[in-house]
Amino acid sequence: MGMSFSHLLIVLLIIFVLFGAGKLPQVMSDLAKGLKAFKDGLKDDGSDNDKNK
């Protein structure tokens, strides 16, 4: 049971109401930076394990 389009739309509407139109671009930017840092951390973590073997 994945998220359907209607569920995604409802979640986005709730986020829009909570943060408002003015703050939403900043929230999305911070989220994107956090996801990029997380992916980079996973990539770095995996390469360290390969070097130790």
UniProtKB/Swiss-Prot annotation:
Molecular function (GO) terms listed?
Answer: protein transmembrane transporter activity
Q: Which domain of life is it from?
A: Bacteria
Keywords associated with the record? Cell inner membrane, Cell membrane, Membrane, Protein transport, Translocation, Transmembrane, Transmembrane helix, Transport
Where does it reside? Cell inner membrane
Q: What is its main location?
A: membrane
Instruction: State one Pfam family annotation.
Output: TatA_B_E
Membrane topology per the entry is: Single-pass membrane protein
- Answer yes or no on keyword Lyase: no
InterPro entries xref list: TatA/B/E, TatA/E
> Mind telling me which residue stretches traverse the membrane in this protein?
1-21
- A GO cellular component entry from the record: TAT protein transport complex
User: Which Gene3D superfamilies has this protein been placed in?
Assistant: 1.20.5.3310
Query: What processes in GO biological process is this protein linked to?
Result: protein transport by the Tat complex
NCBIfam families in the record: PRK01470.1, tatAE
The role this protein plays is: Part of the twin-arginine translocation (Tat) system that transports large folded proteins containing a characteristic twin-arginine motif in their signal peptide across membranes. TatA could form the protein-conducting channel of the Tat system.
Family according to the record: Belongs to the TatA/E family.
Subunit field text: The Tat system comprises two distinct complexes: a TatABC complex, containing multiple copies of TatA, TatB and TatC subunits, and a separate TatA complex, containing only TatA subunits. Substrates initially bind to the TatABC complex, which probably triggers association of the separate TatA complex to form the active translocon.
Entries under HAMAP family matching the protein: TatA_E (MF_00236)
Query: Under which name does UniProt file this protein?
Result: Sec-independent protein translocase protein TatA
Q: Which gene encodes it?
A: tatA
